Each structure stands twice: as C-alpha cells, then as structure tokens.
Amino acid sequence: MTEEQIKILASTLGVDRIMFDEPLKDHTYFKQKGKAGVYFEAKTSTDLEAAVRVAILNNIPFGVLGLGSNTFLSSVDKFFIIKNTSHSISVNGFRTSITSRQSRPEVLIKVDSGSALSMLARYCIHEGISGLEFLLGIPGTVGPGLRNNVGVPPTIKNLLGYHLQMAEIIDRKTGQKKLVSQAFFEFEYGKSFLQKSNDILLAAVFKLVKTPNEDPWEKTSDFEIKGGEIATGPVFKNIEYTDAVRLATRHLTLSPSSLIQEIASDGLKINGVKVSNTNYNSFILNSDFEVEDVARMIRLIKREIRSKFKINLVTQLDMMKLSSK
C-alpha cells in the first residue's frame, strides 16, 4: 500500500477513523497474531460500502473481517482490513402465502452483513418469527454465513441460504452496488458463488414465517474457549454417503471424525495446532499458533485421508485470501 493510497483512505473515510498497525488479536475469535497495516471499523452498511468502494476503485489491497470466528488471515501487514460491525436488523415487510390450502404469514427481515448470526436468531425468536433458530449455535456474522452457506445439515431448511430472498452486494471487480436474488448465490452446502467472485455482501433480506416457536434455546455453539486453548468448529465437511457405505463407517456416519481418528490416534500436532482427542474433526489452538500451522495441518490430514481411504476431504474453515482484485 502506497502513501498516496493511505491519503485517499484518510480523506474518504476520515483521518480520525483509520488506524495503523492494529493487532488482529483484538478483533478475531482465534486471537490471531499479526497486525493490519491499515484498519477501519465499518459501523454501518454505509461505512462498509464507502470503505470497500474506495479500496476497489483505487486498487488498494483489502479484506473484510466479521467476528473472525472461522476465518484465518495471513500476511496482513500491507493490507487494508475493514472490520464489519454493521448490525442493523429490521422488519422489511409482511405478506401471506397459501401453501397446501393453508395460509402462512410471511415476514421479510433485512439484516446488515455484520450482524451476528446468534443475534439475528434471537431477534427473530423475540419477534415470534421462525426459521433461523438453528443459528443459535453458530458463531460468526451474516456476511461469511451466506458466503459459506452455514447451517445444520442434512435438513435444507437449516441452511442459511435457503431463507435468503435477496441481497445487496458490491461487485469486487467494478465497485458497484447491485441487488441480487437468491439464484445469484448458487448455494450448496458450505458453498456459494461469493467464494468464487469475492463480491462483498452489504445486507441481506430473509423470507421467514411468523409462527409460535418451540424452545430453541437448547442449541449451543460448537466453539469453546477453555484454559488458554481454543477449539475450532468442524474443520472438514461430511463425506459422501457412497463413501460411508464403501468404508462401512459406524452407523454409516458421514462425519469424517472417525476417519481422522484412525490417522491421528497417537495425536497429530504441528507447533500450536493439534487435532482434538474428543472430536477429531476439530483443532485445538494454543496461544502461539500460526495461520500457516493450521494450513499445514489441513494439508497433512487431507493427504493421509486420501492415501488411506481414497477420499478427498473438503475444508470447512475459511482460509481468507486477501487481494485487491
């Protein structure tokens, strides 16, 4: 990043709102090491749009960070890091649809991309709106949540993208704001078109149902912080059913945990990263872990599983690649 680019950021966003050499540990769930070369907190979707547009239009290398709960950043000292804390949630409209001769009161909820998934779930529950209760146990924000189509499979209704009606994005190539429909995202479990396009989500509109809810509060996060160590959520996605049958996994489970256990029964550790001995599809990170340690562990497990079981595991963690393009 050049001095001229820094001046452009300061004049556009406010010299009092940009920070230099800001430690990432204060802004990421995993307390990552390293410092952002230039740091800006986008408190509203308008802030986010302004920051992203100025970066794109001036070829400033940047990345957008939510809660950092399942994202790993590396080599950020020369990048412009935008911390997205926009969190407006509002009812955007009501309508009634007829399904199987029954009326369903539907509601449209507009949400800023920096809103916490758990906060969105609680808002809906408080308002008597059902459909997103499964988000209670999922960390992170709406932006990365849609980028990765998070949820609790195998039920498709427990995937965030299923409920999306439309969204506001910024085109990564042109810097222009666009309104897109659900079809634009090409959702699959754990996937969306945003992973390819790297477009930036500003806000989303979800179509939900206003009905009484069952008790949703029993769901809890798979993420824990204990004794100075941090446990990630699931690292790899479920394997295919055909592979579970071929390998005769116990109860035909699709979780790769038992397969990883076979190659890591004696413990797998790379510096500050080790495989959990209670859930083998999870990593335990100590305070001195490095992002590259996580990447190396993922590559090691993929290689060993492919060699032993002829399966190509798919990563669920988001190893964010920063780029000005």
PLM-predicted stretches and their roles:
Residues P23, Y29, A116, T141-V142, ...:
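Short, structural beta-strand-to-alpha-helix junction motif
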Residues M1-L65:
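N-terminal, positively charged, Ser/Thr/Ala/Gly-biased leader segments
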Residues F30-K33, L57, V64-L65, F72-S74, ...:
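Solvent-exposed alpha-helices and their adjacent loops that cap or buttress functional pockets
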Residues S45-A50, V54-P61, H87-L146, T155:
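FAD-binding glycine-rich core of flavoenzymes that anchor FAD
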Residues L65-N70, S113, S287-D288:
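Glycine-rich beta-strand-to-loop/alpha-helix junction loops that act as flexible
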Residues K33-G34, V38-S45, T71-F94, R147-Q182, ...:
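Structural signature of FAD isoalloxazine-binding scaffolds in flavoprotein oxidoreductases
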Residues F20, D26, T71, I170-E304, ...:
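Phosphate/pyrophosphate- and phosphate-bearing ligand-binding catalytic cores of soluble enzymes
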